[in-house]
Design a protein with these regions (language model features):
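Non-catalytic structural scaffold of enzyme domains
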Residues: 1-171
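Short, low-complexity, charge-dense intrinsically disordered segments
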Residues: 169-183
């Protein structure tokens, strides 16, 4: 974003957790330099997306309350700081207009995921299709419906718990699935 901005002002749409993380602070210290970074925790946006309200008036209103002040302050580049936010990209494009660059870090995350899988020799061979299994700390049935709605794919969804910074499977089958996924 720092390399893309022409005005020297960048808006970051993220979650409170991201904005308060050490990783985010490290990235800001490393790359922001003289760039003015405007941050917003976008309270409620993840919940709206998870409710399937990606085109709803309420979602548009929230985005306008966040983005319009950033644009008024000179932001010409917006960064999507949450994996949920690409699902509301059409609304963002409409609100921000054609002269604002929107940076979606998902391709970089995908490349890093591929690198990690290659390093661990867990990348599926290109000669066969991979499979998709999603893990959620929420309701598995709801996650399956969201995956179908937002991604247009059917996939197996397993419920897990997040305890003491560790993923805990809820059943023996899920433990096996998760172990296969992480080993």
């Amino acid at each position: 974003a720092a390399a893309q901005t022409r005005s020297g002002v960048v808006g970051v749409l993220a979650t409170p957790g991201t904005l308060s993380s050490h990783r985010y602070a490290s990235l800001m210290a490393r790359y922001a330099g003289d760039i003015e970074v405007l941050e917003d925790p976008c309270l409620g946006l993840v919940q709206l997306i998870e409710a399937g309200a990606t085109q709803a008036a309420e979602t548009r209103d929230l985005l306008q309350r966040v983005v319009v002040p950033m644009l008024a302050a000179g932001a010409d580049t917006l960064v999507l700081g949450c994996t949920h936010y690409p699902f509301i990209r059409p609304l963002l494009d409409d609100i921000a207009g054609p002269n604002v660059t929107i940076i979606d870090p998902a391709p970089a995350v995908a490349r890093q995921t591929r690198n990690v899988l290659q390093q661990r020799d867990q990348l599926a061979p290109a000669t066969r299709a991979g499979s998709l299994c999603c893990y959620t700390t929420g309701d598995a049935a709801r996650m399956a419906a969201l995956t179908a709605d937002l991604l247009g794919v059917q996939c197996r969804v397993r419920a897990v718990r997040w305890t003491n910074n560790e993923v805990i499977a809820n059943t023996r089958e899920e433990a096996t699935d998760y172990a296969d996924f992480t080993d």
